[in-house]
Amino acid sequence: MSDNEDNFDGDDFDDVEEDEGLDDLENAEEEGQVNVEILPSGERPQANQKRITTPYMTKYERARVLGTRALQIAMCAPVMVELEGETDPLLIAMKELKARKIPIIIRRYLPDGSYEDWGVDELIITD
């Protein structure tokens, strides 16, 4: 038992000031301003009709995809390519990327708040 447990009476939280930012959120709901659109469970977001971003995978996207996939493989996720003695998760992720078998979707946000979703298999990968 520590010394702090003996002196705790539960009333120590009374002197904490309430956050005034919460009042703004409550007032926004009362004014009828809704910033969130909830889709029904059967309805999916609209697919990209015309994409305006480049079809090339950037070096930052490549690094993020390889790191994320290597972490998944290290945590025993199923591997999407045939292994030929590889044990390093990063090397396996690189092999999956080269074979375009990584099951990850890249979401690119645009300045107007919209976004484009690209599958790894849709992007052009340069080395």
UniProtKB/Swiss-Prot annotation:
- What InterPro entries has UniProt attached to this entry? DNA-dir_RNA_polK_14-18kDa_CS (IPR020708), Pol_omega/Rpo6/RPB6 (IPR006110), RPB6 (IPR028363), RPB6/omega-like_sf (IPR036161), Rpo6/Rpb6 (IPR006111)
Repeat is among the record's keywords:
no
Q: Which UniProt keywords apply?
A: Acetylation, DNA-directed RNA polymerase, Nucleus, Phosphoprotein, Transcription
Where does the UniProt annotation locate this protein?
Nucleus; Nucleus, Nucleolus
Question: Which stretches does UniProt call biased (Acidic residues)?
Answer: 1-32
UniProt signal peptide: none
Disordered as annotated region, ranges: 1-52
Q: What is its main location?
A: nucleus
Biological process terms in GO annotation? transcription by RNA polymerase I; transcription by RNA polymerase II; tRNA transcription by RNA polymerase III
Q: Which residues carry this modification: Phosphoserine?
A: 2
The highest taxon in the source lineage is Eukaryota
| An example Gene Ontology molecular-function term | DNA-directed RNA polymerase activity
- Say which family it is in: Belongs to the archaeal Rpo6/eukaryotic RPB6 RNA polymerase subunit family.
Q: What is this protein called?
A: DNA-directed RNA polymerases I, II, and III subunit RPABC2
Organism, by scientific name, is: Bos taurus
